[in-house]
Amino acid sequence: MMNTEGNNGNKPLGLWNVVSIGIGAMVGAGIFALLGQAALLMEASTWVAFAFGGIVAMFSGYAYARLGASYPSNGGIIDFFRRGLGNGVFSLALSLLYLLTLAVSIAMVARAFGAYAVQFLHEGSQEEHLILLYALGIIAVMTLFNSLSNHAVGRLEVILVGIKMMILLLLIIAGVWSLQPAHISVSAPPSSGAFFSCIGITFLAYAGFGMMANAADKVKDPQVIMPRAFLVAIGVTTLLYISLALVVLSDVSALELEKYADTAVAQAASPLLGHVGYVIVVIGALLATASAINANLFAVFNIMDNMGSERELPKLMNKSLWRQSTWGNIIVVVLIMLMTAALNLGSLASVASATFLICYLAVFVVAIRLRHDIHASLPILIVGTLVMLLVIVGFIYSLWSQGSRALIWIIGSLLLSLIVAMVMKRNKTV
């Protein structure tokens, strides 16, 4: 465990610093990529799905906050797995699954970047090969950026958090004045399948709250500040998402939504803010998605470096290739590109949502096992675990009933993580 005293003495973070980190991590590319997908499923009830997604995130955030407060380190969820589950096959499999989850998320966001780029640069076109070209191109560019620079990643993110928030708030404020109640009134409750599918997808828009736990070792009084920070950050983000969902559904027709699901936020900007506003929102979406790919690649490469130092990856994966890049970096990037080409945005969102939910369910298990050490409430953890389990079962069942091929990729991700972990254990790599 890191020496927290040294960190605390050097510019300790306060409540609003941590809240800013959380909001910045959650309110990013995900909402640009996922709002349209959620609206396709729930239509006028989309805001309800974001509200329930926020409740699930609140429970999960509680477990994260207690663990982060008691075990402050920058290792995040990987460190939690090791502490609560040991260094066995199961812990390693979950770490690998989380790594895969981030890879799928990058592919999803790259798809969103491609959709916005085509919408902006080739107005009216939805050519698949153009979307894929831009998606693969941004992955390649950001991989190169990560290979060349370590420090620019953080600087870029700080600037873009402010830009993203300003654009979204501008859109919401403009939308409030022109809300059309008839478009957002819930005439009939959604089917259970659509509801659970949408909850799974909307939870992905909150998944960034885990980044706050990585800052716990820099907080002056983590036992007090971390739980409050998670509550405030997730609460504010929930209100923002609900407002944005109401605005988009009020101003984008069902026909447009079906046609432009991947760029729904930009479609809402056009009638509200005119062409100039539309351009601003699209540019904001391109910046947000590009920076998210950059930041997530940075996170993936750091996790791989961490796992390599713990001998949890084959030696080849950490072998230097060029500048800061390794063979492992290239292998993961190729895998990301293959997933980007093989799956559409909706399928990628489903895979990432399911694997995120499974990883965060494991965090509940860790928190329950360590509840006495982290001073956590067992009833809250049990309720959170049951809620998360219900969402996972409902989400997987909805995918199965729809015959979604994303289910095959989800099962494949689970099996691949488990098999690789077992093989490495057997070969005494770990």
Q: Where in the sequence are the language-model features?
A:
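Membrane-interface "cap" regions at the ends of multi-pass membrane proteins
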Residues: M1-S45, M58, Y62, S417-V430
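Helix-loop-helix junctions that connect adjacent transmembrane segments
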Residues: N3-N10, W47, G124-L133, V158-Y278, ...
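Select transmembrane alpha-helical segments in multipass membrane proteins
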Residues: P12-G22, I55, G86-T101, Y134-I138, ...
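Transmembrane helix-loop junctions in multi-pass membrane proteins
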Residues: I31-L35, A110-F113, F145-H151, Q180, ...
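Hydrophobic transmembrane alpha-helices that form the core helical bundles
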Residues: Q37-L40, F59-I139, T143-S147, V282-N306, ...
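TM-loop-TM module centered on a large, flexible mid-protein loop between adjacent transmembrane helices
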Residues: G76-N87, Q119-E123, L231-N294, E312-S347
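Membrane-interface loop-to-helix entry segments
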Residues: A117, L130-S178, P189-S191, F230-I234, ...
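A generic transmembrane alpha-helix motif of multi-pass inner-membrane proteins
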Residues: A174, L179, I368-H372, A376-V430
